[in-house]
């Protein structure tokens, strides 16, 4: 009987070993995923703290709330993009999900921030590209009319609204690049030689640096 039952026990042992091995792999993967999640949460928390630090919030409780709103927004966007990249969410559904986050995020910020501070948050999420670019256009083209300046600002503002929810620095800058192309076409159509003006602007910048 002992010899007859031996193969059975051997099979059971193999099964248990297989379970242990697979469990070990699963736990390892889980630990790695948990570590990556913790690292990401720390990163977005630091980003949020940096943005909030420039808002001039005097109420510490409000500052913490705003910090958490920004950090959670980063995390929610990351979850959507991760699901899209893993095939669990179609690109179209991912875009819709991202769009649905936008207004509620701004509404949450409005509970503790004024309009100017919300603009600062938007600039913080997009590396300050809007004010930098708008200033650059005015410096390069001092002859711009009020109407042209307003149109440039409108398009850069649209770019920022899109860029603030983008998944990476590259994608954020990509939105501004797209709208800058639109702006340059608009100015070229108005008779401005953008290549010539750009070269002249660079010369002025170099001349300033020498002073």
Show where each model-derived region lies.
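Bacterial Sec-dependent N-terminal signal peptides
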Residues: 1-35
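Charge-rich (acidic/polar
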Residues: 32-211
């Amino acid at each position: 009987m002992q010899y007859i039952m031996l193969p059975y026990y051997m099979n059971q042992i193999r099964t248990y070993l297989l379970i242990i091995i697979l469990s070990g792999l699963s736990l390892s993967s889980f630990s790695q995923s948990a570590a990556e999640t913790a690292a990401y949460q720390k990163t977005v928390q630091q980003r949020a703290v940096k943005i909030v630090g420039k808002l001039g919030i005097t109420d510490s409780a409000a500052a913490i709330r705003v910090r958490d709103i920004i950090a959670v927004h980063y995390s929610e966007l990351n979850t959507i993009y991760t699901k899209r990249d893993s095939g669990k969410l179609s690109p179209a559904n991912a875009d819709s999900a991202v769009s649905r986050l936008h207004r509620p995020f701004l509404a949450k910020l409005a509970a503790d921030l004024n309009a100017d501070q919300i603009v600062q948050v938007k600039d913080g999420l997009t590396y300050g590209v809007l004010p930098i670019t708008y200033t650059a256009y005015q410096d390069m083209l001092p002859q711009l009319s009020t109407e042209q300046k307003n149109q440039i600002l409108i398009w850069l503002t649209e770019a920022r609204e899109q860029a603030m929810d983008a998944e990476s620095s590259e994608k954020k800058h990509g939105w501004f690049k797209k709208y800058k192309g639109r702006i340059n076409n608009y100015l070229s159509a108005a008779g401005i030689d953008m290549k010539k003006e750009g070269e002249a602007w660079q010369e002025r910048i170099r001349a300033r640096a020498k002073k």
